From Swiss-Prot:
Residues spanning the signal sequence: 1-22
UniProt-recorded name of the protein: Tol-Pal system protein TolB
Cellular component terms (Gene Ontology): periplasmic space
Organism: Blochmanniella floridana
Keyword hit for Cell division: yes
Top-level taxon of the source organism: Bacteria
Keywords from the named record: Cell cycle, Cell division, Periplasm, Signal
Length: 460
């Protein structure tokens, strides 16, 4: 390791201090009226501990669960103010009452204090039966700091019971936050999927780009320009250590972890043109995957850890291609929507991908279904949607979206993402993979770019 590398690592670690920010809030903009109705009743507590709970300013468990289910796009949680009565136990449930409201699922819960811990219990009740039937229940004894995580865990359990799909409410996201801070304009941040518990991982006066989670959620790979040119960093989140620094001449960027966690794909221009490379993380050996005079970048892995989707301009404009890492002659185009297509992100089950489609002066997020060959636009109401990332369960995706103060988006499509004028803010958006549900995360103090969703195995 060179003296420069050691100094650089110390700089990164010094800037790693955990800076907390105000939480963001999800604002649903489209699709909630078509979702399945459900009621999450405020959790009850013993009268003798009510005062202690209030003074402790604990998280509102029921509100978090309701928000999670609503944010999935599959449930419409009935506002508490609309409930004529709030049952506290199973025997209080009157099925005919809920039937008139069009609700056949109700969540009841309670919170108590045991020693210095909190005991959270809940029941998921089917009100279409008479008498009402408990179809799921559980209890947790936890420390106060784990209240929000426990609420997300309950949401995951309820979501999977009702849909058969694993929930993603306990996952984390990472993104780059751009602010007006003169000293540190760029920050790599992580947060809960809903924007709460935001933490700064790294701050820099130079651009940070393209964060990517390891499959176990313990590391992030990202691009930094702290040294004056691009370098690729792999950083462990628990102890703040730098595991790898990839710093070849010219461009180093677009990292992507293989699903098995054994390899990292990225793009380099050390030979002039941008080409794809793979590092074996156990040996640090680097293998070149593409070797031509075109720009090949933005790799995304298929589930087998043997095939990559990537962006290439070998046909004249950026399109998405697929290549086998063991046979670089087996490369073929897989995107065909009008205009250009780039920045692919493959679903964890490998059945579809989302990508950025540029066409007629606008930029959308589009989807390609590998099973049917169908391509469709998911964000037709967006002007400059970018960098999509699919949720681990494959039913949602996040992306950055530019709010243009200038009415013409065409002025900016040929510019680099980091050069978009400061008066146009980039926000974090959330949408269902069928395009029917959309929401924005509001409350950030700056522009959010390059969002990426952790795997199901990632936790706090």
């Amino acid at each position: 390791m060179t003296i420069f590398q050691k100094s650089f690592i110390l700089l990164i670690i010094w800037n790693f201090s955990l800076f907390a920010f105000s939480d963001m809030k999800i604002e649903i903009t489209h699709g909630i009226n078509t979702a399945h109705p459900i009621a999450v009743i405020p959790f009850i507590n013993n009268e003798n501990i009510t005062h202690e709970l209030n003074n402790d300013n604990i998280e509102d468990i029921a509100s978090i669960i309701a928000a999670d289910l609503r944010n999935s796009g599959k449930f419409n949680t009935l506002p508490i103010a609309y409930l004529p009565y709030q049952p506290s136990k199973l025997t209080d449930i009157i099925p005919t009452f809920w039937e008139k409201l069009g609700i056949n699922t109700v969540v009841l819960g309670a919170i108590n204090i045991k020693n210095e811990n909190y005991v959270i219990s809940y029941q998921l009740i089917d009100t279409s039966n008479n008498p009402a039937l408990v179809i799921l229940d559980n209890q947790y004894e936890i420390e106060k700091k784990h209240l929000r995580y426990t609420a997300h865990t309950i949401s995951d359990e309820i979501f999977e019971k009702l849909t058969g799909i694993k929930g993603v409410f306990c996952t984390r996201i990472a993104y780059i936050l751009y602010t007006n801070n003169i000293k540190y304009a760029y920050e790599l941040c992580t947060s809960d999927y809903d924007g709460h518990n935001q933490v700064s991982i790294c701050r820099s006066s130079e651009p940070l780009m393209s964060p990517a989670w390891s499959p176990d959620g313990k590391k992030l790979a990202y691009v930094t320009f702290a040294s004056g040119h691009s370098e690729l960093i792999i950083q462990t989140l628990t102890n703040r250590s730098i595991d790898n620094i990839i710093q070849f001449p010219n461009h180093n960027g677009a990292p992507a972890w293989s699903p098995d966690g054994k390899k990292l794909a990225f793009s380099l221009s050390k030979t002039g043109s941008l080409n794809l490379y793979i590092m074996d993380l156990s040996s640090n050996n680097i293998q070149q995957i593409t070797s031509n005079r075109y720009n090949n970048t933005e790799p995304s892995w298929f589930p087998d850890s043997q095939n990559l989707a990537y962006t290439s301009d070998q046909g004249g404009v950026p399109q998405v291609y697929k290549i086998n890492i063991n046979n670089n002659r087996d490369s073929h185009r897989i995107s065909w929507l009008n205009g250009s297509n780039q920045k692919p992100n493959i679903s964890m089950d490998g059945t579809f991908m989302v990508m950025v489609n540029r066409n007629k002066g606008k930029q959308y997020i589009s989807k390609l279904n590998f099973l049917t060959g169908e391509e469709e636009t998911l964000t037709a109401d967006s002007v400059l949607a970018d960098t999509p990332s699919i949720s681990p369960n494959g039913i949602m995706f996040m992306y950055s979206s530019i709010i243009l103060n200038n009415s013409s988006s065409e002025l900016y499509l040929d510019k680099k993402f980091t050069n978009i004028p400061d008066n146009n803010q980039s926000i974090l958006s959330l949408a269902s993979i069928d395009g029917k549900f959309k929401a924005h995360l509001n409350g950030s103090t700056g522009s959010i770019r390059f969002p990426t969703w952790s795997s199901l195995s990632c936790s706090y």
